[in-house]
């Protein structure tokens, strides 16, 4: 079987920068000795958990250990997802990191095991080394002869380095490529001999005085030295899932962009595993074990946990990091209770990292970082009030009040958020504790699980209206 690999192009909008919940986190905030700093790279507090995550980080970077399960357990609003996001940022772009929620695998289009298999294989990278022949030089002259009848075009390309000069015959494809890239005499270009791809490297310094005015994107480079034809080693990094999709159907690479991958047959994956193992032995490829992060892992059922147990023992297995805020609770699909809602055999395979509640000073530091990220100017008194609210309710609720308070402050034409803005936002939007208290007080006015509601208490006056004339 001939395995095809193509680099997946990121089609996301790079210029679109939105402020998300964890957009202020750029790393784990560790020094060179893996010791956590009190506040660094957007991470605050949780020193023991961050130190443990630093050890996991080194395990992944070394690439020698895979197939390990890590459970991050702690109460709500203690930074479990933030810890995983910090780990993702510290790993960089070369190490695959796949994040998903526990409920994402339940789909009508894919089975649970297929969704988990795809997530596992997205987290395993393959670095494929390829030697390519390139022609690099400065364009001296381009001659293109076009037929009057609109037939085949012919042309000649004169290209040089500081040591030699050569003339190449051009066909239709190369002429179209040069026209598309708008290559002119004096440009320094690179041509891939295998596929005919033309890359414009810049403009030669010798032609810097040809024009009086040039665009801001014009880049001047030196004329290449030595031979025109050079061998260059290129490393392509793709995931096993991308190779699966490309080889699963005739136009499989299109599914990388549409997301319509469907069920991939196990025979295809087995052949790809065999081929990748051959490439690894021959030195053509290198396996990069990545990280699979499953948030709200207690939402998985017993069949999924059984699959994860088996998948962790596979040859191509990433490090699986799971997060949960459950205590002693039922495992989905069973009638028995277990710690964190996970079966005991998976807990036995996992190393567990615990997170603690934030202190008042740590909450204040986090809210200060969030206000800077959202470009909201808070007065010292407003920050103290938000810190107090965060300690009594939750950190999420307090951080959500920042943007709301800014809108209230803008309404009164103020550039900074004051205490009165925070108080008004606090009164307008209830937290979970006040909402639960309100429900208990007016429970009879709400519809219960059986569809019943006490109609006699829904109005302000419980007395019946007199309709007699």
Swiss-Prot record:
* Binding sites annotated in the UniProt record for ATP: 74-81
Organism expressing this protein natively: Eremothecium gossypii (strain ATCC 10895 / CBS 109.51 / FGSC 9923 / NRRL Y-1056) (Yeast)
**Tell me, which GO biological process terms does this entry list?**
box C/D snoRNP assembly; chromatin remodeling; DNA repair; regulation of transcription by RNA polymerase II; rRNA processing
Query: What keywords would UniProt list here?
Result: Activator, ATP-binding, Chromatin regulator, DNA damage, DNA repair, Helicase, Hydrolase, Nucleotide-binding, Nucleus, rRNA processing, Transcription, Transcription regulation
Give the catalysed reaction(s), semicolon-separated. ATP + H2O = ADP + phosphate + H(+)
In terms of Pfam families, this protein maps to: TIP49, TIP49_C
Please verify whether the record's keywords include Nucleus. Answer: yes
Q: What is this protein called?
A: RuvB-like helicase 2
Q: What role is this protein assigned?
A: DNA helicase which participates in several chromatin remodeling complexes, including the SWR1 and the INO80 complexes. The SWR1 complex mediates the ATP-dependent exchange of histone H2A for the H2A variant HZT1 leading to transcriptional regulation of selected genes by chromatin remodeling. The INO80 complex remodels chromatin by shifting nucleosomes and is involved in DNA repair. Also involved in pre-rRNA processing.
Q: Where in the cell is it found?
A: Nucleus
């Amino acid at each position: 079987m001939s395995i095809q690999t193509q680099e997946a192009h990121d089609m996301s909008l790079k210029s679109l920068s939105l402020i998300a919940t964890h957009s202020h986190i750029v790393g784990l905030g560790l020094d060179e000795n893996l010791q956590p700093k009190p506040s660094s790279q957007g991470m605050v507090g949780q020193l023991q958990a961050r130190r443990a995550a630093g050890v996991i980080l080194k395990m992944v970077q070394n690439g020698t250990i895979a197939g390990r399960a890590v459970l991050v357990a702690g109460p709500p609003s203690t930074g479990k997802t933030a810890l995983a996001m910090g780990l993702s940022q510290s790993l960089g772009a070369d190490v695959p990191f796949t994040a998903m929620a526990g409920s994402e695998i339940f789909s009508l289009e894919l089975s649970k095991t297929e969704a988990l298999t795809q997530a596992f294989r997205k987290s395993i990278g393959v670095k494929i080394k390829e030697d390519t022949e390139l022609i690099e030089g400065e364009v001296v002259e381009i001659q293109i002869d076009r037929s009057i009848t609109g037939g085949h075009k012919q042309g000649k390309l004169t290209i040089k380095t500081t040591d030699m000069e050569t003339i190449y015959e051009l066909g239709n494809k190369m002429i179209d490529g040069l026209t598309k890239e708008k290559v002119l005499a004096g440009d320094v270009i690179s041509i891939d001999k295998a596929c005919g791809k033309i890359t414009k490297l810049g403009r030669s310094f010798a032609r810097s005085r040809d024009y009086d005015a040039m665009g801001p994107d014009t880049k001047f480079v030196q004329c290449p030295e030595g031979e025109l034809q050079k061998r260059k080693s290129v490393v392509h990094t793709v995931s096993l899932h991308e190779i699966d999709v490309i080889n699963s159907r005739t136009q499989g690479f299109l599914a990388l962009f549409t997301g319509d991958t469907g069920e991939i047959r196990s025979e295809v994956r087995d052949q790809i595993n065999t081929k990748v193992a051959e490439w690894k032995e021959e030195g053509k490829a290198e396996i990069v074990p990545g990280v699979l992060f499953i948030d709200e892992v207690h939402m998985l059922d017993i069949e999924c946990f059984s699959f994860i147990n088996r998948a962790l023992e596979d040859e191509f297995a990433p490090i699986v990091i799971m997060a949960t805020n459950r205590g002693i609770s039922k495992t989905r699909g069973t009638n028995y209770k277990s710690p964190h809602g996970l079966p005991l055999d998976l807990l036995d395979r996992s190393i567990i990292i615990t997170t603690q509640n934030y202190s008042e000073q740590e909450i204040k530091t986090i809210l200060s970082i969030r206000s800077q990220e959202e470009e909201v100017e808070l007065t010292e008194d407003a920050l103290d009030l938000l810190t107090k609210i965060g300690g009594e309710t939750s950190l999420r609720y307090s951080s959500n009040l920042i943007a709301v308070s800014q809108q209230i402050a803008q309404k009164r034409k103020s550039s900074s958020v004051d205490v009165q803005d925070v108080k008004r936002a606090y009164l307008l939007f209830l937290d979970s504790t006040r909402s639960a208290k309100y429900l208990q007080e007016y429970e009879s006015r709400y519809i219960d699980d059986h569809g019943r509601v006490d109609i006699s208490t829904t109005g302000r006056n419980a007395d019946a209206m007199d309709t007699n004339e």
